[in-house]
């Protein structure tokens, strides 16, 4: 089957609805929607839940942008895209809970296609999901990775190990020499063996996010926490900000190409703190995190 951007868009809109509905059902609060238009072509729906019962902030963004020509920054690395019209669409989300025992989660799925008359389209899918705990629980990590493995299984035995490694490699803070979290799945430039296969995998990843995350939320939401745990959560959120602003390709590309800043920075935690040369107390649960987020086979 030839690439069908319309079907992808319809799936992404339904996915945004589904994820927002499930997060709201767990939290009790509702998302506020901000629909926006892009002057150069396209637009999106940004939805944010603030100060809910469980989630301090959850942002779920859908965007669909298109144009007659790719920005120069994009064609510099992919000269085959020069002179082509393009469409780029996706759903991206980040959830920052109040409770430090509930991890932060991130997911996105996206599709890109560039076309010109008389030539085959250039297209690919990308996406994934990853988990950033503040306090490590092995059963949560095993569930997260088992869900990732199980959704990958129908697409081949090598898919989960390959995309897990890509995720571990990608969500790494080089300036800190540490992982952002315990990873999950990350894939990009997926266009083989054919459109139907790739689209099915992207759908599996998108639909798998809530299956991976919400059982962890339910398991941890009643755990009692205090000022110590909150301060550590805010400190570790600093790593999240550092990664997004220094290393994340999507954030940098969006800001450098005139993307919608409010939507791009929706992933930022609402509160965060830095403290010069802070070190956790030896033997404490906070100190245990650095070992917990080391790359390993969880299943």
From Swiss-Prot:
Residues 240-275 are annotated as: Important for dimerization. The record marks 175 as: Important for dimerization. Pathway: Porphyrin-containing compound metabolism; protoporphyrin-IX biosynthesis; protoporphyrinogen-IX from coproporphyrinogen-III (O2 route): step 1/1. The keyword Cell division does not apply. Its EC number is 1.3.3.3. PANTHER family: COPROPORPHYRINOGEN III OXIDASE, MITOCHONDRIAL, OXYGEN-DEPENDENT COPROPORPHYRINOGEN-III OXIDASE, MITOCHONDRIAL. This is Oxygen-dependent coproporphyrinogen-III oxidase. It comes from Salmonella dublin (strain CT_02021853).
